[in-house]
Regions:
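Membrane-proximal transmembrane or re-entrant/amphipathic helices at the cytosolic face
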Residues: 466-518
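Alpha-helical transmembrane segments of multi-pass membrane proteins
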Residues: 115-139, 352-376
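Short membrane-interface helical motifs at transmembrane helix boundaries
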Residues: 97-116, 334-352
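Helix-loop junctions and terminal segments of transmembrane helices
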Residues: 58-73, 284-315, 325
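Membrane-interface helix-loop junctions in multi-pass transport and translocation proteins
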Residues: 151, 162-200, 205, 387, ...
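Signature of the first transmembrane helix
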Residues: 4-65, 70, 92, 99, ...
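N-terminal membrane topogenesis motif
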Residues: 1-22, 78, 82, 221-247, ...
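Membrane-interface junctions at transmembrane-helix termini in multi-pass inner-membrane proteins
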Residues: 134-156, 365-395
């Protein structure tokens, strides 16, 4: 496995966990300051904010990283810089327009009824500067990632979250005596301050990037015009943006279909709301948390594949693909089994909602499929095929709608039917991606390695199931949960080594600890 993108994956994974931990603590504290009503006012502005970010910059960071990596592979440092300059100009314009639209359109959004809560005015205008700065940092992150440097992105994410939380909590507490609308608006200011802090971090790393004069390499090939670069940037970024829009679209379709079909199945409205919350508000966030590693891998693999693709290094593309899929198996299969076996204590300890066990157990199977989908999407994007994952997601979405409509209305399945529809949706999209990966790289699936992962995780699952239930009357739930989880991961590694699914070379390729295996 290529140690470069492994290192980047580890760095982004650590940053992802840190950011989520800070965010979780912040949400608890902010809820205590604002209360339920204040949080509701604060949340009212976010759909518009996210929509404007989608319009102004979504998909651009990955597109910039692809174009930058291609030029660096050919030692065209000047071309890479031109990509950045043109992208930065475009994003400055779109970000500025979107920011102004949010600020000056706040009154209209409320008076037209698009935002029903008039007290959200301050939250809307407070988020306007964040739109501008987020478009800037998306440009810098994409460019620096094109150099296959993930540390700047990771540090900027942590700094952004820290500043956001400090300002959010401080401003909310200071402005609370002036009323909930002012306090919610103060909390919204944190997004802009955090984004500006991230921009300063990225600016520092930008000036530390290697210059063409310091590399000793020169490029004498053809140079693309600004129009050609802009055209390629849009060609890449638009499909990537559409892919990111598919996720909220799926959530909205769930909202339209699942509650209605649960009612048709005979569930009362209060239970329908409760069951829907178990799936979308509890089970799905756990799946997203369990795939932090593959989400990071999907980001770091894009420039690595683009670099090899630009050099027409077919063996390099195959090796990077095989290496990333190997890591995907190890990052998803054991966590799928862990969440399935430990679903009850997980939802009880985190949410105090033991009834969410069924939805969580079923949805746990999507950890593997989501991880495969994330990484294969990154590979296809690196191969300049960003439209393929979007089409595949569209096809799988149709399947999900059909399954949601049919399975959820079966009384004995209920919310379990919706959970199975979610698994089928992401599983089919992952399978379609794999078919195209086979077409363009020659790699499909290492069945032997996958089987070793499944056997190791299966044996682990049986042993931790027995261990957890044996210790139930001996240890408190939280201690039993932590001990069993650690025990499970250790068992998985040991069994993988015994089955020769893990070896010394795997250890040697790992960042930080690799030197101990050499």
């Amino acid at each position: 496995m290529a140690s470069g993108f492994l290192k980047g994956t580890l760095i982004l994974t650590i940053a992802g966990f840190v950011v989520k931990a800070i965010g979780s603590i912040n949400w608890i504290l902010l809820s205590r300051i604002l209360g339920g009503e204040g949080i509701g006012i604060y949340q009212m502005a976010f759909p518009i904010y996210l929509l404007l970010l989608q319009i102004s910059s979504a998909g651009v960071p990955i597109a910039i990283s692809i174009l930058t990596a291609e030029r660096l592979a050919l030692h065209d440092f000047g071309g890479a810089k031109r990509v950045f300059n043109i992208s930065f100009t475009m994003l400055t314009i779109t970000g500025f327009i979107a920011s102004l639209a949010m600020y000056f359109g706040a009154d209209w959004l409320i008076s037209s009824g698009l935002i029903a809560e008039s007290r959200a005015y301050y939250s809307i205008i407070a988020l306007a500067p964040a739109v501008f700065f987020v478009t800037w940092i998306s440009c810098f992150r994409g460019y620096i990632q094109g150099y296959e440097m993930m540390t700047p992105t990771a540090i900027s994410q942590i700094v952004e979250q820290l500043l956001r939380v400090i300002v959010m909590l401080g401003a909310a507490a200071i402005l609370l005596p002036y009323g909930l609308p002012a306090a919610a608006g103060g909390a919204s200011l944190g997004a802009g301050v955090g984004a500006f802090g991230a921009f300063l971090v990225l600016l520092y790393y930008y000036y530390k990037l290697p210059k063409a004069s310091s590399t000793g390499e020169s490029y004498n090939g053809p140079r693309e015009s600004a129009k050609e670069i802009l055209s390629r940037l849009l060609t890449l970024s638009i499909p990537i943006s559409l892919a990111s829009i598919m996720l909220p679209l799926t959530a909205n379709l769930d909202l339209l279909i699942v509650p209605r079909r649960l009612l048709d199945a005979g569930f009362p409205m209060n239970e329908v709301t409760e069951l829907f919350g178990y799936l979308t508000g509890m089970a799905v966030p756990l799946i997203n948390l369990a795939t932090i590693i593959t989400a990071a891998l999907a980001t770091s693999i894009v420039p690595a594949i683009s670099h090899a693709f630009a050099k027409r290094d077919h063996q390099g593309i195959y090796d990077r693909t095989a290496g990333s899929m190997r890591l995907t198996f190890m990052a998803t299969v054991p966590f799928t089994v862990l969440l399935y076996v430990l679903a009850a204590p997980t939802v009880t300890l985190i949410y105090n909602a033991p009834k969410a066990e069924l939805a969580t157990q079923i949805t746990a199977f999507s950890i593997f499929f989501l991880g495969v989908h994330q990484v294969t999407t990154g590979i296809l994007q690196g191969l300049n095929r960003p439209r393929i994952p979007v089409i595949n997601m569209g096809i799988s979405l149709i399947i999900k709608v059909i399954l949601n409509w049919t399975l959820t209305a079966i009384p004995w399945l209920g919310i379990g039917g919706a959970a199975w529809a979610t698994v089928a949706d992401i599983g089919f999209a992952a399978l379609l991606n794999l078919i195209y990966i086979k077409k363009y790289t020659g790699y499909f699936l290492d069945i032997s390695l996958l089987w070793k992962n499944v056997v190791s995780a299966g044996v682990m699952g049986i042993l931790i199931f027995l261990s957890y239930h044996y210790l139930t009357d001996i240890l408190p739930m939280w201690a039993n949960f932590i001990l069993t989880g650690i025990e499970g991961l250790l068992l998985y590694v040991i069994i993988m080594v015994l089955l020769k699914g893990l070896n010394k070379n795997d250890g040697a390729s790992m960042p930080l600890i690799g030197r101990f295996f050499r």
